[in-house]
Regions:
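N-terminal secretory signal peptides that target proteins for export/translocation
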Residues: 1-2
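Bacterial N-terminal signal peptides
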Residues: 6-16
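Lumenal/extracellular ectodomains and adaptor appendage modules
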Residues: 19-207
Length: 207
């Protein structure tokens, strides 16, 4: 009887442990965070585009924090053909951050929000991006899109600049093998004397 009881206990432990193993913290193979100041609003459009690692079971339940003073604009997943589809999500408010939680049916996901603290009343404009990684990330890029008619864009830490296919200038910070709970910060400053939004000047891609 003691032997049978021991076997039953062992079986129960294995069964109850399995879900916990399945829910272990996932790894992201790639995450790109795009910061687009004055794109289609006098704010900073913040876009997260990520991909979970191949060994992460799908659907993958993910949770990301954004500052509590902002609200999610959209959450989506990307299908194998590259098309985006809206995704249901929940939010949990904290003292300083709001957690966005969703279940991604495919490896690729995207969510967006606006940083509405950008002051565009003076030519000297600046904003700060600060975020803490919830998961390990194999390849992380933070990309700033320079607004149309802006000049003297400076980032801290320094970034590499390049011209995109849309003719705009982009500044990129790249990191690899980022651990969970690491702090990611980027200060951005630039000069812009008008209120023209970038979206009103960028031509849509050719069909």
């Amino acid at each position: 009887m003691n032997r049978l009881t021991s076997l039953l206990i062992a079986l129960v432990l294995v069964i109850t442990a399995s879900p916990a193993l399945a829910q272990a913290s996932p790894t992201l193979s790639a995450l790109e965070i795009e910061l687009w100041p004055e794109y289609d609003k006098p704010s900073v459009l913040v876009i997260f585009r990520g991909t979970v690692a191949p060994n992460v079971p799908l659907p993958a339940t993910l949770s990301f924090e954004i500052p509590s003073k902002f609200t999610p604009l959209a959450v989506a997943y990307r299908d194998p053909q590259g098309l985006l589809y809206d995704l249901k999500y929940t939010t949990t408010a904290g003292a300083n951050a709001t957690a966005i939680t969703f279940s991604a049916p495919t490896a690729s996901f995207q969510f967006e929000y606006y940083d509405t603290t950008l002051d565009t009343t003076t030519p000297s404009r600046k904003f700060n991006f600060a975020w803490r990684t919830p998961y390990p990330i194999q390849a992380l890029n933070v990309v700033v899109q320079q607004p149309v008619n802006a000049s003297n864009l400076v980032t801290t830490p320094k970034t590499e600049s390049s011209i995109g296919v849309d003719g705009l200038t982009y500044f990129k910070q790249s990191r690899s093998n980022v651990n969970a709970n690491e702090s990611i910060t980027l200060d951005v400053a630039y000069i812009k004397s008008d209120s023209i939004l970038t979206a009103s000047t960028v031509k849509p891609p050719a069909a």
